[in-house]
């Protein structure tokens, strides 16, 4: 992101107030990280230049198309065209009145069409108060961050056999899944894994010990609470 003010809450994470410097430094960092088979995520896409109120319904960023293209998008475009950046993280804020993470013209037309990014987009930490899951998937946002079980179940409803069967949503889900899987399978995240690999979940001795200790402490706390309540009742009865 761009330094609009020296008082920005996360200026320490961003490179510069200049889009070219920001973009070229970002491209160099992306190139170095991806050369090791790791997937860096360029963020926050886009025009997320303040922390105050950014996640309370989505801070509204008002700007012209010229400013958006020449300043804010340029810092993201350079890592993509210079270093083939594969991933971006969308922002909490809105562009005008539309959340950046569900903006079709931004995520599909510009990011995939004009800039040519082939990987996947992921949201910032998911906030269901204004981030609508279906809208973001259809717009081209592939991987909602911090999803939990009921969120996944809700998306399944849009499949062919779901209660909300919708071919457009189903196709968008397939496209998103393909982008995520294709990107990850071409990273080092799949090193040493083949179709014959079997993943086995095992608990270590210290995990088992910690779980037993937690249960024991929980039981002792419950017993202590009951004893305190009973003692209080006895003292009250004596009075």
Where are these regions (language model features)?
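Glycoside hydrolase catalytic-domain context in secreted enzymes
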Residues: 1-239
């Amino acid at each position: 992101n761009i330094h609009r003010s020296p008082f920005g809450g996360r200026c320490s994470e961003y490179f510069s107030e200049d889009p070219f410097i920001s973009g070229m430094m970002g491209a160099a960092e992306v190139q170095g990280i991806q050369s090791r088979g790791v997937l860096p995520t360029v963020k926050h896409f886009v025009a997320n230049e303040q922390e105050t109120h950014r996640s309370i319904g989505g801070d509204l960023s008002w700007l012209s198309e010229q400013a958006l293209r020449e300043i804010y998008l340029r810092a993201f475009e350079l890592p993509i065209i210079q270093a083939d950046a594969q991933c971006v993280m969308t922002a909490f804020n809105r562009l005008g009145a539309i959340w950046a993470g569900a903006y079709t013209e931004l995520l599909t037309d510009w990011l995939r069409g004009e800039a040519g990014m082939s990987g996947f987009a992921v949201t910032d930490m998911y906030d269901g108060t204004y981030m609508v899951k279906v809208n973001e998937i259809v717009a081209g946002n592939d991987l909602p961050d911090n999803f939990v079980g009921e969120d996944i179940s809700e998306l399944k409803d849009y499949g062919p056999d779901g209660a909300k069967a919708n071919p457009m949503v189903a196709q968008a889900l397939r496209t998103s899944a393909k982008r995520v899987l294709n990107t990850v399978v071409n990273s080092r995240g799949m090193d040493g894994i083949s179709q014959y690999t079997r993943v086995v979940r095992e608990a270590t001795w210290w995990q088992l010990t910690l779980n037993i200790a937690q249960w024991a402490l929980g039981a002792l706390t419950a017993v202590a609470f009951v004893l305190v309540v009973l003692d209080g009742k006895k003292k009250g009865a004596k009075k």
